[in-house]
Protein backbone atom coordinates (compact mmCIF):
# COMPACT_ATOMS: atom_id res chain seq x y z
CA UNK A 1 0.00 0.00 0.00
CA UNK A 2 1.45 3.37 -0.97
CA UNK A 3 0.38 6.95 -0.39
CA UNK A 4 2.15 9.73 -2.22
CA UNK A 5 1.71 13.38 -3.12
CA UNK A 6 2.04 15.17 -6.43
CA UNK A 7 4.72 17.68 -7.30
CA UNK A 8 3.97 21.31 -8.19
CA UNK A 9 2.87 20.26 -11.68
CA UNK A 10 0.51 17.59 -10.37
CA UNK A 11 2.77 14.68 -11.36
CA UNK A 12 3.04 11.63 -9.11
CA UNK A 13 4.82 8.29 -9.11
CA UNK A 14 4.28 5.31 -6.86
CA UNK A 15 4.96 1.62 -6.56
CA UNK A 16 1.94 -0.62 -6.21
CA UNK A 17 1.41 -4.29 -5.50
CA UNK A 18 0.87 -6.55 -8.48
CA UNK A 19 -2.70 -7.33 -7.44
CA UNK A 20 -3.71 -3.77 -6.57
CA UNK A 21 -7.11 -3.17 -8.23
CA UNK A 22 -7.26 0.64 -8.01
CA UNK A 23 -5.38 3.87 -7.62
CA UNK A 24 -7.43 6.64 -6.04
CA UNK A 25 -7.01 10.30 -5.21
CA UNK A 26 -7.78 11.87 -1.84
CA UNK A 27 -9.28 15.01 -3.36
CA UNK A 28 -7.84 18.15 -1.70
CA UNK A 29 -10.29 20.54 -0.07
CA UNK A 30 -9.58 23.25 -2.65
CA UNK A 31 -10.84 21.06 -5.49
CA UNK A 32 -14.28 19.82 -6.47
CA UNK A 33 -15.14 16.15 -6.10
CA UNK A 34 -15.01 14.69 -9.63
CA UNK A 35 -18.28 13.11 -10.74
CA UNK A 36 -19.03 10.62 -13.51
CA UNK A 37 -22.62 9.79 -14.42
CA UNK A 38 -23.81 11.38 -11.21
CA UNK A 39 -21.49 9.45 -8.88
CA UNK A 40 -18.14 10.40 -7.26
CA UNK A 41 -15.26 9.13 -9.39
CA UNK A 42 -12.04 9.39 -7.41
CA UNK A 43 -10.45 6.14 -8.58
CA UNK A 44 -8.98 4.48 -11.66
CA UNK A 45 -8.73 0.75 -12.28
CA UNK A 46 -5.29 -0.73 -12.77
CA UNK A 47 -4.15 -4.16 -13.93
CA UNK A 48 -0.46 -4.81 -14.24
CA UNK A 49 2.28 -7.41 -14.20
CA UNK A 50 5.43 -7.47 -12.11
CA UNK A 51 7.40 -4.94 -14.17
CA UNK A 52 4.62 -3.00 -15.83
CA UNK A 53 4.45 0.79 -15.80
CA UNK A 54 0.98 2.29 -16.17
CA UNK A 55 -0.29 5.86 -16.23
CA UNK A 56 -3.44 6.95 -14.48
CA UNK A 57 -4.37 10.63 -14.34
CA UNK A 58 -7.05 12.56 -12.50
CA UNK A 59 -8.49 15.83 -13.77
CA UNK A 60 -9.47 18.03 -10.83
CA UNK A 61 -11.13 21.43 -10.90
CA UNK A 62 -9.88 24.02 -8.43
CA UNK A 63 -12.89 25.77 -6.90
CA UNK A 64 -11.47 27.02 -3.62
CA UNK A 65 -11.98 25.67 -0.14
CA UNK A 66 -15.62 25.52 0.89
CA UNK A 67 -16.48 27.41 4.06
CA UNK A 68 -19.82 25.62 4.43
CA UNK A 69 -21.43 22.50 3.00
CA UNK A 70 -24.23 20.10 3.87
CA UNK A 71 -23.64 16.39 4.50
CA UNK A 72 -26.52 14.08 3.57
CA UNK A 73 -26.28 10.69 5.33
CA UNK A 74 -28.13 7.60 4.13
CA UNK A 75 -28.01 4.12 5.65
CA UNK A 76 -29.35 0.62 5.07
CA UNK A 77 -31.11 1.21 1.77
CA UNK A 78 -30.94 -2.60 1.45
CA UNK A 79 -32.68 -3.26 -1.84
CA UNK A 80 -32.80 -6.93 -2.75
CA UNK A 81 -36.06 -7.41 -4.62
CA UNK A 82 -37.82 -5.64 -7.48
CA UNK A 83 -40.63 -4.41 -5.23
CA UNK A 84 -38.07 -2.76 -2.95
CA UNK A 85 -36.58 -0.97 -5.95
CA UNK A 86 -40.07 0.22 -6.86
CA UNK A 87 -40.57 1.54 -3.33
CA UNK A 88 -37.25 3.40 -3.47
CA UNK A 89 -38.02 4.82 -6.90
CA UNK A 90 -41.68 5.74 -6.41
CA UNK A 91 -41.97 6.52 -2.69
CA UNK A 92 -38.60 7.39 -1.15
CA UNK A 93 -36.77 9.35 -3.85
CA UNK A 94 -39.76 11.57 -4.77
CA UNK A 95 -39.66 12.80 -1.17
CA UNK A 96 -35.88 12.94 -0.80
CA UNK A 97 -34.93 14.67 -4.06
CA UNK A 98 -37.00 17.86 -3.55
CA UNK A 99 -35.78 18.03 0.05
CA UNK A 100 -32.14 17.86 -1.05
CA UNK A 101 -32.56 20.32 -3.91
CA UNK A 102 -34.82 22.86 -2.19
CA UNK A 103 -34.28 22.63 1.57
CA UNK A 104 -30.61 21.85 2.09
CA UNK A 105 -27.90 24.50 1.89
CA UNK A 106 -25.68 23.92 -1.13
CA UNK A 107 -23.25 22.45 -1.82
CA UNK A 108 -24.55 19.07 -0.70
CA UNK A 109 -22.49 15.88 -0.50
CA UNK A 110 -23.89 12.51 0.46
CA UNK A 111 -22.60 9.34 2.04
CA UNK A 112 -24.43 6.01 2.16
CA UNK A 113 -23.30 4.12 5.24
CA UNK A 114 -23.40 0.50 4.14
CA UNK A 115 -25.86 -2.26 3.28
CA UNK A 116 -26.73 -0.71 -0.04
CA UNK A 117 -28.27 -4.03 -1.05
CA UNK A 118 -29.57 -7.07 0.81
CA UNK A 119 -27.30 -9.99 -0.12
CA UNK A 120 -28.23 -9.64 -3.80
CA UNK A 121 -25.10 -8.57 -5.64
CA UNK A 122 -26.65 -7.72 -9.06
CA UNK A 123 -28.66 -5.03 -7.30
CA UNK A 124 -25.54 -2.91 -6.75
CA UNK A 125 -25.90 -1.60 -10.30
CA UNK A 126 -29.64 -1.06 -9.77
CA UNK A 127 -28.95 0.85 -6.55
CA UNK A 128 -26.39 2.98 -8.39
CA UNK A 129 -28.92 3.98 -11.04
CA UNK A 130 -31.42 5.00 -8.37
CA UNK A 131 -29.10 6.91 -6.02
CA UNK A 132 -27.59 9.03 -8.80
CA UNK A 133 -31.07 10.53 -9.27
CA UNK A 134 -30.56 12.49 -6.03
CA UNK A 135 -28.39 14.85 -8.04
CA UNK A 136 -25.48 15.25 -5.60
CA UNK A 137 -22.27 13.20 -5.20
CA UNK A 138 -22.99 10.30 -2.83
CA UNK A 139 -20.02 8.31 -1.52
CA UNK A 140 -20.55 4.63 -0.73
CA UNK A 141 -19.48 2.55 2.27
CA UNK A 142 -19.49 -1.23 2.03
CA UNK A 143 -21.64 -3.10 4.57
CA UNK A 144 -21.91 -6.76 5.50
CA UNK A 145 -24.87 -7.27 3.15
CA UNK A 146 -22.79 -5.82 0.29
CA UNK A 147 -20.38 -8.77 0.49
CA UNK A 148 -21.01 -11.88 -1.58
CA UNK A 149 -21.50 -14.54 1.09
CA UNK A 150 -21.17 -17.32 -1.50
CA UNK A 151 -17.45 -16.52 -1.78
CA UNK A 152 -15.08 -17.70 0.94
CA UNK A 153 -12.24 -15.19 0.31
CA UNK A 154 -12.94 -11.79 1.86
CA UNK A 155 -11.18 -9.74 -0.83
CA UNK A 156 -13.10 -11.54 -3.58
CA UNK A 157 -16.39 -11.12 -1.73
CA UNK A 158 -16.02 -7.36 -2.34
CA UNK A 159 -15.93 -7.75 -6.13
CA UNK A 160 -19.52 -6.72 -6.88
CA UNK A 161 -19.25 -3.58 -4.73
CA UNK A 162 -15.90 -2.68 -6.30
CA UNK A 163 -17.23 -3.15 -9.82
CA UNK A 164 -20.00 -0.64 -9.14
CA UNK A 165 -18.33 1.86 -6.80
CA UNK A 166 -14.57 1.32 -6.73
CA UNK A 167 -12.38 0.81 -3.66
CA UNK A 168 -13.82 -0.25 -0.32
CA UNK A 169 -11.53 2.14 1.56
CA UNK A 170 -10.50 5.66 0.59
CA UNK A 171 -10.48 9.27 1.79
CA UNK A 172 -11.47 12.70 0.56
CA UNK A 173 -11.58 16.29 1.78
CA UNK A 174 -14.39 18.84 1.85
CA UNK A 175 -13.96 22.14 3.66
CA UNK A 176 -12.10 21.57 6.92
CA UNK A 177 -13.15 17.90 7.07
CA UNK A 178 -11.07 14.87 6.12
CA UNK A 179 -13.39 11.94 5.47
CA UNK A 180 -12.10 8.38 5.84
CA UNK A 181 -14.06 5.37 4.60
CA UNK A 182 -13.05 1.87 5.73
CA UNK A 183 -14.27 -1.68 5.20
CA UNK A 184 -14.75 -3.05 8.73
CA UNK A 185 -16.27 -6.38 7.68
CA UNK A 186 -14.24 -9.58 7.33
CA UNK A 187 -16.48 -11.91 5.38
CA UNK A 188 -15.13 -15.47 4.94
CA UNK A 189 -18.37 -16.73 3.43
CA UNK A 190 -21.64 -18.22 4.74
CA UNK A 191 -23.79 -15.95 6.87
CA UNK A 192 -21.16 -15.09 9.47
CA UNK A 193 -18.72 -12.21 9.49
CA UNK A 194 -16.30 -10.52 11.84
CA UNK A 195 -16.14 -6.80 12.54
CA UNK A 196 -12.50 -5.94 11.96
CA UNK A 197 -10.18 -3.82 9.83
CA UNK A 198 -7.45 -5.49 7.79
CA UNK A 199 -3.76 -4.78 8.31
CA UNK A 200 -3.65 -3.48 4.73
CA UNK A 201 -6.20 -0.79 5.54
CA UNK A 202 -4.45 0.15 8.77
CA UNK A 203 -1.13 0.52 6.92
CA UNK A 204 -2.83 2.75 4.35
CA UNK A 205 -4.60 4.77 7.05
CA UNK A 206 -1.34 5.46 8.85
CA UNK A 207 0.10 6.90 5.64
CA UNK A 208 -3.09 8.76 4.78
CA UNK A 209 -3.09 10.59 8.09
Outline where the language-model segments fall:
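Short, acidic Ser/Thr/Gly-rich low-complexity loop/linker segments typical of extracellular
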Residues: 1-11, 15
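Residue-level detector of beta-strand structural context in well-folded domains
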Residues: 2, 56, 169-170
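Residue-level marker for the onset of beta-strands and adjacent loop->beta junctions
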Residues: 10, 54, 167-168
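Extended active-site neighborhood of metal-dependent phosphoesterases/phosphodiesterases
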Residues: 29-36, 42-46, 121-208
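N-terminal secretion/transport leader regions
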Residues: 25-26, 58
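Short, solvent-exposed loop/turn elements at domain surfaces
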Residues: 4, 24, 79-85, 188-190
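Short Pro-Gly-centered beta-turn/loop motif in secreted/extracellular proteins
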Residues: 13-24
Amino acid sequence: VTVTTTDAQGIYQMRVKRNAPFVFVSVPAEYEIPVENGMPKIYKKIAMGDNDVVQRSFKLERTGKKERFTLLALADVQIGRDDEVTMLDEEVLPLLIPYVQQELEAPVYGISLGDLVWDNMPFHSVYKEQIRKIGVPVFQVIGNHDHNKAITVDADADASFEAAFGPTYYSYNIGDCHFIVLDDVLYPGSSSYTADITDEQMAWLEQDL
